[in-house]
Amino acid sequence: MAKSIRKINLRKGKRRIPRGVTHIQASFNNTIITVTDVRGQVVSWSSAGACGFKGTKKSTPFAAQTAAENAIRILIDQGMKQAEVMISGPGPGRDTALRAIRRSGVVLSYVRDVTPIPHNGCRPPKKRRV
């Protein structure tokens, strides 16, 4: 006679994430928001392109705001209360994305600018002649 097989519940429950790290990567062409837990594992991400903005509209501050709201919305459902923010890049959406995160109700423990600054490294691209 065959033994009855115990069913194992493979579905994970909702992860509770009280603290997290929000990375804002603002380039001249797009803004990417990635939210990780304190160990560095990605919990949620969004970008202006993933929100439906195409071409030059991806580089607007409004697109960055929409991307930040989409990335944070998932985390509020998972119980995030406190976050650290790391901003990288010179793009136009960096301040607007930070403002959207502040308005979401998550308490920010600190905001750090981690933009890499060259000490006379690579030669910059040539100036545009339009």
Swiss-Prot record:
Q: Which UniProt keywords apply?
A: Chloroplast, Plastid, Ribonucleoprotein, Ribosomal protein, RNA-binding, rRNA-binding
Per the record, its GO cellular-component terms are: chloroplast; ribonucleoprotein complex; ribosome
Which GO terms fall under molecular function for this chain's record? rRNA binding; structural constituent of ribosome
Q: Where in the cell is it found?
A: Plastid, Chloroplast
Question: What stretch or stretches form a coiled coil here?
Answer: none
Q: Which GO terms describe its biological process?
A: translation
- Domain of life assignment: Eukaryota
Record-linked Pfam families:
Ribosomal_S11
| Chief location | plastid
InterPro entries hit by this protein: Ribosomal_uS11, Ribosomal_uS11_bac-type, Ribosomal_uS11_CS, Ribosomal_uS11_sf
Sequence similarity: Belongs to the universal ribosomal protein uS11 family.
The UniProt subunit note reads as follows: Part of the 30S ribosomal subunit.
The protein's name: Small ribosomal subunit protein uS11c
| Species annotation | Anthoceros angustus (Hornwort)
